UniProtKB/Swiss-Prot annotation:
Gene: mtgA
Organism, scientific name: Pseudomonas fluorescens (strain ATCC BAA-477 / NRRL B-23932 / Pf-5)
Transmembrane segments: 12-31
EC number(s) given by UniProt: 2.4.99.28
A GO MF term: peptidoglycan glycosyltransferase activity
Chain's role: Peptidoglycan polymerase that catalyzes glycan chain elongation from lipid-linked precursors.
Pathway: Cell wall biogenesis; peptidoglycan biosynthesis
Protein name per UniProt: Biosynthetic peptidoglycan transglycosylase
Length: 240
């Protein structure tokens, strides 16, 4: 009986691995129609008896402002071009910070955030962390860095029910994602740690200060020229 259950478990695991690889390969070329986080937000609204309309319009790489691309990297993951999905230094710093108590600091890279938003549910269980690591590794192996950032910008939450750069630009500033200014992009990047509480359109003093920091980091990174590094970053042969 135990041997039978073990064989079934191994077979299920193999099917999951094959299926997840095929899904990640497909999404390298096909825009994701939605995300697990969007489904979760919709279910939450039904449970709370407060239905929301999800706003999201996919925009390809060339129709998103370079200002926003650089701002997000500057604010969220400055080692994005170099790492393979995990920032070990940031993880170690977060562990030390969290051991000292107080607020919990995260250390998620853009690649990890893509895997969470696309495929997983909210929470901090070991199972979820393991699946996050698995999908992050697959994304880094099979997607170029530019694709990872493109999917991130089209999937990340920027307010209650507002997902992706185009919806965020329209919602907060009344412009398209292609026309976001440096100031607007820095404000959108500044609220990403807590987009359902902080507002890019009505920024608090803290958000304004953080946006100023993001702009300084953008300048230090080299502005739009920094995006050229995405084409020169470390990638596996399969991501070429």
């Amino acid at each position: 009986m135990l041997r039978y259950l073990f064989r079934r478990l191994v077979k299920a695991l193999m099917w999951f691995m094959v299926g997840s690889v095929l899904l990640v390969l497909l999404l390298r070329f096909v825009p994701p129609p939605g995300t697990a986080l969007m489904v979760e937000r919709k279910i939450e609204s039904w449970v709370d008896n407060d239905p929301i309309d999800l706003q999201r319009t996919w925009k390809p790489w060339d129709e998103i402002s370079d200002n926003l691309k650089v701002a997000v990297i500057a604010g969220e993951d400055q080692k994005f071009p170099e790492h393979w999905g995990f920032d070990i230094d940031a993880i170690q710093a977060a562990l030390i910070h969290n051991e000292r108590g107080g607020s919990i600091r995260g250390a998620s890279t853009l690649s990890q955030q893509v895997s969470k938003n696309l495929f997983l549910w909210s929470g901090r269980s070991y199972l979820r962390k393991g699946l996050e690591a698995w999908f992050t590794a697959l994304i880094e192996v099979f997607w170029p860095k530019q694709r990872i950032l493109e999917v991130y910008l089209n999937s990340v939450e920027w307010d209650e029910g507002v997902f992706g750069a185009e919806a965020a630009a329209r919602h907060h500033f009344g412009v398209s994602a292609a026309n976001l200014s440096r100031q607007q992009a820095s404000l959108l990047a500044a609220v990403l740690p807590n987009p359902r509480v902080w507002s890019a359109a009505r920024p608090s003093t803290y958000v304004m200060q953080r946006a100023g920091w993001v702009r300084r980091q953008m300048s230090q990174l080299g502005g739009a020229d920094y995006l050229n590094r995405l084409n020169e970053s470390r990638r596996a042969p399969w991501a070429e």
